[in-house]
């Protein structure tokens, strides 16, 4: 999240590999949040990155990046997909298997969004031995793990009798 001037150093100090980054999220166009982005992307290219990367950020981010690359005659070895969000509405920016990222408009001197990472609800933990002993088929086990009551062989099975509830889904706001 965000890419100020020290982003490469911060990634190295925290033993994060540049090439493993799948996405970059920019909150607003102030220098301390964006000036490290061209250098980070250029370093990835110099290191031979081939995999595309997605960048979510405010309007004009893509034009700024293209202008910067043009000024220094930079050529990326990989595709850069810029997705610009609106500073006026909550938007789902990215959805993955285990989390969702949303933009949340906030007041600032320039268009700005906070970023909220929301963990999806976790499945219930099934007592596997109990389910096996009862001969529960796969589809019944899956329903119980989703927290859904289900009928099986004339019985109404309730998830709380077969599973332990998951911890509450977490969220992080930046």
Regions found by a protein language model. Give the residues of each.
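Alpha-helix N-cap/helix-start and coil->helix boundary motif
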Residues: 8, 18, 31, 61-62, ...
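Metal-dependent phosphodiesterase/nuclease catalytic metal-binding core
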Residues: 86-174
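Active-site neighborhood of divalent metal-dependent phosphoester bond hydrolases
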Residues: 49-86
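Small/polar loops that bind or transfer phosphate-bearing groups
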Residues: 2-3, 26, 56-57, 103, ...
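Active-site metal-binding motif and surrounding structural segment of the metallo-beta-lactamase
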Residues: 5-56, 84-86
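Structured loop/turn residues at beta-strand edges in well-structured enzyme cores
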Residues: 16-19, 78, 97-99
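Conserved beta-strand hairpin/beta-sheet module of binuclear metal-dependent hydrolase folds
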Residues: 1-20, 50, 115-117, 124, ...
